[in-house]
């Protein structure tokens, strides 16, 4: 994997601190373990963009903080940049990689254990509304996306191959948000079963959900796990 060469490079030429070097080495070893165990890949030139996206999704699925995920992505980008310059590989699979947005942590009154229990227990009905509500809570909690981004998601914005969603952020800027395997599975089941074709979350007339309705949905479920009176989608962005 040329890891030793890379470590020597950042140590002697880049003169990174011992702490930074250790972090890089740890991140890369974790990635190598993932691709070897999951895909039996032992050569960096065999790594694809999709494979890296799967790795990132697995990190997010294990509730790793977005700041930690971003650091690991940075380590991988530096590693592949070195491989390209050193002519060890011909292509760089990290070029189109976008780091997940770093968002605020959950407020103390929305404990992680409580959120986990919300998904584990039968709080959501086995109906269109129940499945829709669960997806809304999932997307807010696991991606940190904004309310305006969520209500504007269309089925065409969901990249099932790379496990990511394209959203329109502030000032009409597009960004790609990685999603976990479980969330992608729930999305696929919801879209296919209810034959969703345009807006992911829509009213009966096909128009996107109103912001106030999303607020009511979030408040309904947070009331089951929190005693705080004022609750909103922002409380789920961690």
Residue ranges, per PLM feature:
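Conserved catalytic core of the tyrosine transesterase superfamily
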Residues: 1-238
